[in-house]
Amino acid sequence: MYRWLVRILGTIFRFCDRSVPPARALLKRRRSDSTLFSTVDTDEIPAKRPRLDCFIHQVKNSLYNAASLFGFPFQLTTKPMVTSACNGTRNVAPSGEVFSNPSSCELTGSGSWNNMLKLGNKSPNGISDYPKIRVTVTRDQPRRVLPSFGFTLNSEGYNRRPGGRRHSKGNPESSLMWKPQEQAVTEMISEESGKGLRRPHRTVEEGVQKEEREKYRKLLERLKESGHGNSVCPVTSNYHSSQRSQMDTLKTKGWGEEQNHGVKTTQFVPKQYRLVETRGPLCSLRSEKRCSKGKITDTEKMVGIRFENESRRGYQLEPDLSEEVSARLRLGSGSNGLLRRKVSIIETKEKNCSGKERDRRTDDLLELTEDMEKEISNALGHGPQDEILSSAFKLRITRGDIQTLKNYHWLNDEVINFYMNLLVERNKKQGYPALHVFSTFFYPKLKSGGYQAVKRWTKGVNLFEQEIILVPIHRKVHWSLVVIDLRKKCLKYLDSMGQKGHRICEILLQYLQDESKTKRNIDLNLLEWTHYSMKPHEIPQQLNGSDCGMFTCKYADYISRDKPITFTQHQMPLFRKKMVWEILHQQLL
């Protein structure tokens, strides 16, 4: 009857005798491993020496075997520990799994329980490359993975966040696996709110050229709708660009002035520049000067569909596309050889055009000598802003006025009025039409004060003996030109932004009627007169927000010679330098 009890007790003592020598041998190897890998993770729990708990563990397993022999239900209240014979580490099984024999690599149980323990392959140094145990259970239970708590150098476990907090990565093979540091960093970046891969930010210059002219056009429309000519509205415009892309930074803020009944009243125009650039001086204009458009990023296009399409897409013109781009240089840079480069596209067209056309293009691309370029650079360089560089026509041009002719700067009244007087002096020569030019302050005063305010402006001048009358128009932040052709009895409004000026032409036509009746006592037949706003496709249009003053001056230059207007936007840098020399020497080239 008690024969089974004797067999069980004998089994207990036999297991205790067998487990002591292997445990000591494995303990030494485990202690060496723990010492070797203690630098990997200081928080890792070292393996303990099997003492009394090993005996208790064997007793419980023996009782379990006895219960299984007689068919009694028996469950362990604690988790049995399995000692791997391969690496000497102990694994704690989940509460739902029971091992019948912990001393071997293959565990077999009674009844329908059939558990198989699979260990990872050993590395040459005796350490398992994959320190995990797979247990396959055949009774409707999913396969479970039993990770080992003893990690090796090439094993995978926790990943650390930048803040020091740990987080584990899910893995169908192992829930505790260390990943290489490089891979962990990559996954961490990619999983945290998608910050791993970002599209690079577009540079400030990219796309500005495409929107430059459109923004300027919308500004003009908004100012036109905001009120009448006497309305006051501040403007602040900030444009950011870089030296390498042939753009500067200019912040314009302030007020302009207009003459009204002998008193200058404030009008919506910038009065002061604040220029930031790597070359050249800091330029600030006088507060009493009314300035045209400010320095804005250049959107000059090349001749041809290819360059025009690139500009529409917002791409910057590459400096190596053609020699024409090199001609768009900075004023004041001191480069002498750039102006003498021939534009390849224009040279090609010159071969196919007539002699008159070729002469006109050659005249526009007149080369400047080194002495001329040196003189221009000195005028645009450092120096007192109030220094007078040219004086004529009862006008004085200072260094600050000349520096408005730098690329991307807005021209002021003094520069435009001085240049218009140079046109009048040239047309006094034989072969040019009789020309009269009004000041830039004429139209604002006429509009605000009527004919009586400007009645004395033509004292000693008979307008009806002239052939062409030019009236520069300044509307808030934009320059345009009205051409009165007395030979054809017509008024034409030229705007580099394509705006219409019917109301301006009507005011000037009424002025001619009053002038004729006062000076000649003759009424004009207004039915014989026409006025017309030039359409954008009929005259060159500016492609940026800074060259409207230059376009106005060149409109006047070509019309005063009775020549068709054939210049383009890309010629503006050359025209600016030529105008500097012409003002300094008080003669046109």
UniProtKB/Swiss-Prot annotation:
Disordered as annotated region, ranges: 148-179, 191-210
Keyword 4Fe-4S appears in the UniProt entry: no
Domains: entry comment: The N-terminus is necessary and sufficient for nuclear envelope targeting.
Enzyme Commission identifier(s): 3.4.22.-
GO cellular component: cytoplasm; nuclear membrane; nuclear pore
Example of a GO biological process term: fat cell differentiation
Post-translational modification: Polyubiquitinated; which leads to proteasomal degradation.
Catalytic site: H478, D495, C548
Cellular compartment(s): Nucleus, Nuclear pore complex; Nucleus membrane; Cytoplasm
Originating species: Pongo abelii (Sumatran orangutan)
Region feature (Axin-binding): 71-382
Top-level division of the source organism's lineage: Eukaryota
Region described as Protease: 395-559
Protein name: Sentrin-specific protease 2
Sequence motif Nuclear localization signal, residues: 28-31, 46-51
InterPro entries found in the cross-reference section: Papain-like_cys_pep_sf (IPR038765), Peptidase_C48_C (IPR003653)
Record keyword Ubl conjugation present: yes
